[in-house]
Curated annotation (Swiss-Prot):
Organism: Homo sapiens (Human)
Clinical note on disease: Intellectual developmental disorder, autosomal dominant 26: A disorder characterized by significantly below average general intellectual functioning associated with impairments in adaptive behavior and manifested during the developmental period. Additional MRD26 features include autism, short stature, microcephaly, cerebral palsy, and facial dysmorphisms.
Phylogenetic lineage: Eukaryota, Metazoa, Chordata, Craniata, Vertebrata
Name assigned to this protein: Autism susceptibility gene 2 protein
Keywords recorded for this protein, A-Z: Autism, Autism spectrum disorder, Cell projection, Chromosomal rearrangement, Cytoplasm, Cytoskeleton, Intellectual disability, Nucleus, Phosphoprotein, Transcription, Transcription regulation
Span list, region Important for regulation of lamellipodia formation: 289-472
Compositional bias of kind Polar residues: 177-192, 436-447
Length: 1259
């Protein structure tokens, strides 16, 4: 056989097999094949083979022509590899172009078949039409296939046409009689039955990377349908057995398939494809042209021939690189696919269209088919053995099929000749055999040591490792083929089991399967079929639950249910929420979250990683992997049971830990209504710890969610059972401290956040929106209210716990606000600097209101936080009054400041905004630190965040504005903070999320709050949030407020949007101009005296939507009006005076008024009834975030600053401080970014885009 010359290493095997085939052909009817003698003889053989394919259709022509046709095509391939490629292109084009023509060819088949046989040389003439030829030559071929100059092209064209004609009848038969067999026919039942069949065959080849080619449509389809699979498999196996038995005499194969082609329409194509694939493998170079026809005849054969012509010629050159050749040629073939569709729509449909189909149904079915093929392979075991003889041919054919598959699945496997499955498809049935029988030959070898895959191991790491066994492929494959017999019973069982699973899972995951097809195709092609099966099984078990992991879904949809049935049931509350929580919420971001679910990814990861699976498969004995993988449950059992045990233990442990923790928190809360430190300290341990055991706080939260009443009642009222316990609010604060204690554990302990949320929610979150809620939070009545909303929301989103976190901030904020109310009056009376201090206090209060979800105050000033919580209602009311008064004064003051400092601060602030310049930054930071120190002294509670807010704000605006003021006396003290702030601010600018926390950390003893701020509240609370959270960070806090305001409807959105900042997910355009501008209003109030004045002047927005928030803003302005006025007047005054700014103000004001109207509705609803949901809305992001992503876990806390606090344990107060910003955010829906680090002009510019300020601040 010519194969030896073509493929040296691999080809040698083919040589032996091809020699065997030659013997068979000599026995069966070599004369017919030899009639072609030389290249012409080969062409003739090809044409004869093609015609024999046509004869199959009409009258099985001498099988000898079939055997002879394979050999001559191989020689032809050798003769002209490039021509083959061209022919392949032309061939593909011809097939596609002449899809209609192919139908015509079906009519013309007998005559044209004869003509083609008669004039194979004339067919060569068509070579000139290699690419364009297919289109023109379609009919030309039909009438004069000889016109092509290249024998290969001629043969290929003839084969294509004949194959089309034959294939069309076969396809029609398969489609009609074997629609069950022909998955493609199912997909494209008979849109042009031949066309549908071509596609189906191509798709089958592709999707059935295992047994598409020779097994072709019939067998592939058989794989698709279990019963029919078995029936078709039986018949195809009979055909294969007969054909393979006759394969030794190629004539027998040809005859049997040809006759069977007519007799067993769907099955014969399999045999035809299998036999031809084998024969083609043997006569890769000669038969490539014919092979395409054959592949097209029995869809699989068409796929094989097409690649083989290219691959085979290349295979000749590099036997070890057949895969590379295939890859190389596969890309050319894909181009032909591309070329063919344009030139030959029918052919293109045949190949590219089949690809889509292959991707569509084949993926879903490819698992079933793979499974089915796993079973039938034994049936086709004789074929597998026979194939093992021509394994070299198979390798060649497989490689060629790889090329073809690559071309066919050029999308997924262009460069991957990954269709080694298809290459093993040469006997599609054998490929299913390949799993059991061919598995040894092609599937095992493909999977563990893919002969073709070994060539393109590059495509996959496992294949790379697998390539070495190609020799095993020929020798071991045969042996494996025999073991396949023993495996067959197992595989038959597996086939039934897996087919059942696949059918069940595919029915459910058909859509998901469609998604995975490319992935599966790659996997199939890369990890030979066995690997695919392993992955399928593994993935089925592992990924079925995750629609987002659709590729695995298609592969492992079925096993996954058991895994989750076993796993979720055990860890139901825990993991279901972690995995399913993110997943059940059905949030758009969940699918990613689920894969991110590292723990489960790891659980599944044992088999999930394609590389890991291949490694597992490769590491395991060739057959074992199939057994293990096929019995994926077993594999999962070793891994999953352990995981399940830990998971179950984790779930139980976390649950118990949470219960204990809740109980302790209750006790502590009861014991220390004021001392949040103790509770938060405990809470971090329990909350952080249990979350640690759990995959994430998400899991714990899921746990809490699992016991949503407790968790979300706890989140709402007391963390354990928030409603009943007063401590939960403190726990909420504690949770925030816990959050800052353990950033991730914190996030993990979103339950803690839930408790914090209950605290923040009942006491702070709601109070931030509604003082009563704050009070209720403290008392626990609000908590119950929150619990009710939390339970619905928390179960769904688990974010409520984090949203409840804000209320605790309100608690401390309230104390501080009462103090701040006096401080505001006092500061108003006092110098503007004092006013800034009081503003800082009020800012803290407002920030706490905004960041009420953040338990941060607890870490810094837990007692104060409690005290604040106690007096939060009174303080809020006084603060509101004070802020109402201060709204005007700060406005004017800030106006004055902005105008007076406009020139000075405009440049300084701009420069600082550019990169937090420390020249003014230090002065401002010093002042801010001084104010912070004063504020901290006054309100030792979480208001540390106020400094943080100021420092963050100074980072954006306040820090810089307040820094000059504060910097004078307090600069020395706060310089540390200021410097740290500067660092943090820079980080703010660079790491939007981190910087805010860092700034907060710098300004505050607990940076975690800052971090929390960065993620959730602090961003909004902090000016940094303005810059950092421009979209997300700002959105975090704004989102907090937004969540509170719009949480009910935004609660879900935050999760998807909120990476770490669930709020950003509050992307309802509030983040942008509408809400964002309102948020910016608050931030502007804090940061931009003018902006604040502007926003506050828009009292309809502020007063109506968030009087509290606006008053908090006013307090911010009163506290930081100098800072803000200073800087903002410096660089904002231009805006305020700026017609641009005035215009923007007007536009934004209108927008904000509109938004505020919405917000008012939201506020009122949320304050009264929605607030719990709003808290939930807040939690949903984190909760949703927590389940899937750690960052999302943070977001859950992050909104609450719980996660942020967890990350930045020290900053939780800052986070809490930034927690109030949600209120501000509520008012200033704009993301924290509006908190201007940049001039108001920039802020205004950024307000609508929501990116400008972020970008500017980032700068």
């Amino acid at each position: 056989m010519d194969g030896p010359t073509r493929g040296h290493g691999l080809r040698k095997k083919r040589r032996s097999r091809s020699q065997r085939d030659r013997e068979r052909r000599s026995r069966g009817g070599l004369g017919a094949g030899a009639a072609g003698g030389g290249g012409a003889g080969r062409t003739r053989a090809l044409s004869l083979a093609s015609s024999s394919g046509s004869d199959k259709e009409d009258n099985g022509k001498p099988p000898s022509s079939a055997p002879s046709r394979p050999r001559p095509p191989r020689r032809k391939r050798r003769e002209s590899t490039s021509a083959e490629e061209d022919i392949i292109d032309g061939f593909a084009m011809t097939s596609f172009v002449t899809f209609e023509a192919l139908e015509k060819d079906v009519a013309l088949k007998p005559q044209e078949r004869v003509e083609k046989r008669q004039t194979p040389l004339t067919k060569k003439k068509r070579e000139a039409l290699t690419n364009g030829l297919s289109f023109h030559s379609k009919k030309s071929r039909l009438s004069h296939p000889h016109h092509y100059s290249s024998d290969r092209e001629n043969d290929r064209n003839l084969c294509q046409h004949l194959g089309k004609r034959k294939k069309m009848p076969k396809a029609l038969r398969q489609l009609k009689p074997g629609q069950n067999s022909c998955r493609d026919s199912d997909s494209e039942s008979a849109s042009g039955e031949s066309k549908g069949f071509h596609r189906s065959s191509s798709r089958e080849r592709l999707s059935d990377s295992s047994a598409p080619s020779s097994l072709g449509t019939g067998y592939f389809c058989d794989s698709d349908s279990d019963q029919e699979e078995k029936a078709s498999d039986a018949s195809s196996e009979k055909l294969f057995n007969t054909v393979i038995v006759n394969k030794d005499p190629e004539l027998g194969v040809g005859t049997l398939p040809e006759h069977d082609s007519q007799d067993a329409g769907p099955i014969v194509p399999k045999i035809s494809g299998l036999e031809r694939s084998q024969e083609k493998s043997q006569d890769c170079c000669k038969e490539p042209i014919f092979e395409p026809v054959v592949l097209k005849d029995p869809c699989p054969q068409v796929a094989q021939p097409i690649p083989q012509p290219q691959t085979e010629p290349q295979l000749r050159a590099p036997s070890p690189d057949p895969d590379l050749v295939q890859r190389t040629e596969a890309p050319p073939q894909p181009p032909p696919l591309s070329t063919q569709p344009p030139q030959g729509p029918p052919e293109a449909q045949l190949q590219p269209a089949p690809q889509p189909q292959v991707q569509r149904p084949p993926r879903p079915q490819s698992p079933t088919q793979l499974l089915h093929q796993n079973l039938p392979p034994v049936q086709a075991h004789p074929s597998a053995q026979s194939l093992s003889q021509p394994l070299s041919a198979y390798n060649s054919s497989s490689l060629s099929l790889n090329s073809l598959s690559s071309s066919r699945s050029s999308t997924p496997a262009k460069t991957q000749p990954a269709p080694p499955h298809i290459s093993h498809h040469p006997s599609a049935s054998p490929f299913p055999l390949s799993l059991p029988n061919h598995s040894p030959l092609h599937s095992f070898t493909p999977t563990l040591q893919p002969p073709a895959h070994s060539h393109h191991p590059n495509m996959f790491a496992p294949p790379t490792a697998l390539p070495p066994p190609p020799p095993l492929t020929s020798g071991s494959l045969q042996v494996a083929g025999h073991p396949a017999g023993s495996t067959y019973s197992e595989q038959d069982i597996l086939r039934q089991e897996l087919n059942t699973r696949f059918l069940a899972s595919q029915s459910a995951d058909r859509g998901a399967s469609l998604g995975p097809p490319p992935y599966l195709r790659t996997e199939f092609h890369q990890h030979q079929h066995q690997h695919q099966h392993t992955h399928q099984h593994t993935h089925q078990h592992t990924f079925t639950p995750f629609p987002h992991a659709i590729p695995p879904t298609a592969i492992m949809p079925t096993p996954a249910p058991p895994m989750f049935d076993k796993y979720p049931t055990k860890v139901d509350p825990f993991y279901r929420h972690s995995l399913f929580h993110s997943y059940p919420p059905a949030v758009s971001g969940i699918p990613p979250m689920i894969p991110p679910t590292g723990p489960f990814g790891s659980l599944q990861g044992a088999f999930q990683p394609k590389t890991s699976n291949p490694i597992d498969v490769a590491a395991r004995p060739g057959t074992v992997p199939h057994t293990l993988l096929q019995k994926d449950p077993r594999l999962t059992d070793p891994f999953r049971p352990m995981l399940r045990k830990p998971g179950k233990w984790c779930a139980m442990h976390v649950h118990i830990a949470w219960q204990i923790y809740h109980h302790q928190q209750k006790v502590k809360k009861q014991m220390q209504s004021d001392p949040h430190k103790l509770d938060f300290g405990l809470k971090p341990e329990f909350l952080s710890r249990p979350p640690g055991p759990s995959l994430f706080g998400a899991i714990h939260h899921p746990h809490d969610l699992a016991r949503p009443s407790t968790l979300f009642s706890a989140a709402g009222a007391a963390h354990p059972t928030g409603t009943p316990f007063g401590p939960p609010p403190h726990h909420s604060n504690f949770l925030n401290p816990a959050a800052h204690l353990e950033p991730f554990n914190r996030p993990s302990t979103f339950t803690g956040l839930a408790a914090v949320g209950g605290n923040a929610f009942g006491g702070l979150g709601n109070p931030s929106v509604t003082p009563n809620s704050m009070f209720g939070h403290k008392d626990g009545p609000s908590v119950q209210n929150f619990s009710n909303p939390h339970e619905p929301w928390n179960r769904l989103h688990r974010t409520p716990p984090s949203f409840p976190t804000p209320p605790p901030w309100l608690k401390p904020g309230e104390l501080e606000r009462s103090a701040s109310a006096a401080a505001h009056d006092r500061d108003r009376d006092v110098d503007k600097r004092d006013s800034s201090v009081s503003k800082d206090d009020k800012e803290r209060e407002s920030v706490e209101k905004r960041h009420s979800s953040h338990p941060s105050p607890a870490p810094v000033l837990p007692v104060n936080a409690l005290g604040h919580t106690r007096s939060s209602t009174e303080q809020i009311r006084a603060h509101l009054n004070t802020e109402a008064r201060e709204k005007d004064k700060p406005k004017e003051r800030e106006r004055d400041h902005s105008e007076s400092r406009k020139d000075l601060a405009a440049d300084e602030h701009k420069a600082k905004e550019g990169h937090l310049p420390e020249k003014d930054g230090h002065g401002h930071e010093g002042r801010a630190a001084g104010e912070e120190a004063k504020q901290l002294a006054r309100v030792p509670s979480p208001y540390v965040r106020t400094p943080v807010v100021e420092s963050a704000r100074p980072n954006s605006t306040s820090s810089r504005e307040a820094e000059p003021r504060k910097g004078e006396p307090a600069y020395e003290n706060p310089k540390k903070s200021s410097e740290v702030k500067v660092k943090e601010e820079r980080k703010e600018d660079h790491d939007l999320p981190p910087e805010a926390p860092q700034t907060h950390r710098a300004s505050e003893p607990p940076p975690p709050n800052s971090s929390s701020s960065v993620h959730p509240g602090p961003l909004a609370s902090m000016p940094m949030t303005v810059g950092v959270t421009g979209i997300h960070p700002m959105n975090s806090i704004s989102s907090l407020d937004r969540t509170r305001m719009m949480t009910p409807f935004m609660g879900i959105s935050p999760l998807p949007g909120g990476e770490r900042f669930p709020y950003p997910s509050f992307h309802w355009d509030p983040i942008r101009d509408p809400l964002r501008d309102p948020y910016r209003e608050l931030d502007i109030h804090r940061r931009d005296p003018l902006g604040r004045d502007f926003l506050l002047r828009n009292d309809p927005l502020h007063r109506l939507s968030t009087p509290r928030l606006y008053e908090a803003d006013r307090s911010f302005r009163d506290r930081e009006p100098h800072d803000y006025s200073h800087h903002h007047h410096h660089h904002h005054h231009p805006l305020s005076v700026d017609p641009r700014r005035e215009h923007e103000r007007g536009g934004h004001l209108d927008e904000r008024e509109r938004l505020h109207m919405l917000r008012e509705d939201y506020e009122h609803t949320r304050l009264h009834s929605v607030h719990p949901a709003s808290l939930d809305g807040h939690l949903p992001h984190p909760s949703l975030i927590t389940p899937g992503l750690p960052s999302m876990h943070y977001p859950r806390i992050s909104p609450t600053a719980g996660n942020q606090n967890g990350l930045l344990n020290k900053t939780p107060p800052t986070a809490a401080l930034s927690a109030p910003p949600p209120l501000i955010s509520t008012l200033g829906g704009r993301p924290v970014s509006p908190r201007r680090t940049t001039p108001l002009s920039a802020e205004i510019r950024e307000r609508p885009p929501s990116h400008t300020l972020k970008d500017i601040e980032a700068r």
